[in-house]
């Protein structure tokens, strides 16, 4: 893999999650452009720089020896990547503080470097939260590959930060620089809420939660076919989002024990709040993690999963395949994985490579619900 070479450092970076023979690199031309632009400003060593949405730590790891840098974002995998890439390049793994998107920053920043996220609601929430954290003369510099840079990103910077200057294109990347100007205080439109009729629930969704404005059609197809009569089974909701699958299942399985896990900190925050609203003080484990990687082998009886098919702008079934492998490791012999998936993804044949038996529980014109038994 090529090294990231900038005026700040030469770094050997890897992506997360680890994939054998991964053809994708852990940085792009937008990272390079952003670092070149910042270096040209010759910031003092005591300058405070906040880095947002740094997918694999390329920005923060480049800056760690040159300014006081803090990284923040909504991805547990990005946090893991930052720590691994710092250590991989001879730095202390914890030398850059990381603030999850569900928590708040401390102090003021002279520069904020933003990788424009796929979900613009996350960008909007982050820009609103920056109010009160920008030092006089601060700049917010957003970077993206042009094909992933919507006009709305510049409009949000203008609305919440100040006048925006777009750069020339460089290697198909562009920067948007906003000079801090006092704006009237803005209240956040997040979290959003929506109601379900069956089961009767009101669900809260923080800014980066998938389908935050309404139930996604895959989950809608899945809900009527969730397993019943589970007794005191140990159940995991893998990639839980706002927690709707686990919560709906828990309502009909009062003795079962639930673990909800997602790599999005905002999803975990939403799931925790939704569980409490629906089920009060009933015991539950809700955590941000790399799927079931940290779960003890053969410790679960049931896994529920509506697997994702993209990681930021990268589309594919590699995350789903990894989740299926993790579920197999975590399930007891005889345990079952229940999933929903688009018909065209061919999950039945993939599951058959890992599990003893795979059956179709239900189907719609677009989705299949499958049960895979270990």
Curated annotation (Swiss-Prot):
A GO CC annotation given for this chain: cytoplasm
Species of origin: Pseudomonas putida (strain W619)
Domain of life: Bacteria
Gene Ontology terms, MF aspect: 23S rRNA (guanine(1835)-N(2))-methyltransferase activity; nucleic acid binding
Family per similarity comment: Belongs to the methyltransferase superfamily. RlmG family.
UniProt-listed PANTHER family: RIBOSOMAL RNA LARGE SUBUNIT METHYLTRANSFERASE G, RIBOSOMAL RNA SMALL SUBUNIT METHYLTRANSFERASE C
Intracellular or extracellular location(s): Cytoplasm
Family annotation (Gene3D superfamilies): Vaccinia Virus protein VP39 (3.40.50.150)
Catalysed reactions, as listed in the record: guanosine(1835) in 23S rRNA + S-adenosyl-L-methionine = N(2)-methylguanosine(1835) in 23S rRNA + S-adenosyl-L-homocysteine + H(+)
Keyword Protein biosynthesis recorded: no
UniProt entry tagged with the keyword Cytoplasm: yes
InterPro entries membership: DNA_methylase_N6_adenine_CS, rRNA_m2G-MeTrfase_RlmG, RsmC/RlmG, SAM-dependent_MTases_sf, Small_mtfrase_dom
Enzyme Commission number: 2.1.1.174
Gene expressing this chain: rlmG
Assigned keywords, A-Z: Cytoplasm, Methyltransferase, rRNA processing, S-adenosyl-L-methionine, Transferase
CDD domains according to UniProt: AdoMet_MTases
Biological role stated in the UniProt entry: Specifically methylates the guanine in position 1835 (m2G1835) of 23S rRNA.
Entry protein name: Ribosomal RNA large subunit methyltransferase G
A Pfam family assignment: MTS
HAMAP family: 23SrRNA_methyltr_G (MF_01859)
